[in-house]
C-alpha cells in the first residue's frame, strides 16, 4: 500500500474513533498501536488520549515504520501474531484497520491481551460487508436519535448489533472482558467523501423510546430493505 494514501483508510472513522477513545480512561503505561503503518493516527491518538508518554507502533512494513518514527512514535518491526514485547508492558492497545489482514486473528488478540497490563483496554476497528436492514429514512432517524442522546452517544454507538456480534465474541474468546462493539455503515457520496453512520441494535434503540417513537421506529424497520453493505466494526475490551 502506498503510505501516502493509507491515511484515507482511517479518515471515515476518525470522528467515531475520537468519541470512543475519549470515553476511555487514560492508559497507565505506553500505548501500543499494532499495524501502525506510517503513523497517520499518531496525532489523533496523542490529542484524544493526551498521551505524553511512549506511543509504541508495531508493523511489518519497514518503509512505513521509518515514517512513523519520524512522527515521534517508537516504531518496532514485528509480527502481530508474536509481539516482540514483554508481558503486561503496555497500558492499552489499538488495532485499527489491521485485524482483517491477519491470518490468525485469535492469536493476535491473545497477544494483545498478553502485553496489555491488567486493567488496560483494547480498541479494535476493522472493515467487513454484511447483509443488514437499511433505508434512508432509518438512517436519518438514527442520526436524530444520536443527536438527542448527546451525553450517552458512546453507549448507543457500542450496542453490539448483529453484524458486530462475531467480532465481540472473537475478542472475548481471546481473554478480554467488558467487550462492547458497534457497526457503522460506510456511505460514499463521491470518490473523495465518505461518512460512517451507526447501526444501533433494535433492543438498545427500543429502550430509549417513548411508545409513540417506538411505533415509528418499528414501522421504519419493517419498511427497510436488506442490503449488502460495507461496514466498519469497532469494539472495546478491558
Task: Give short role names for the model-derived ranges.
Residues 165, 178-238:
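Conserved Class I S-adenosyl-L-methionine
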Residues 123-187:
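Conserved catalytic/acceptor-binding region of the Class I
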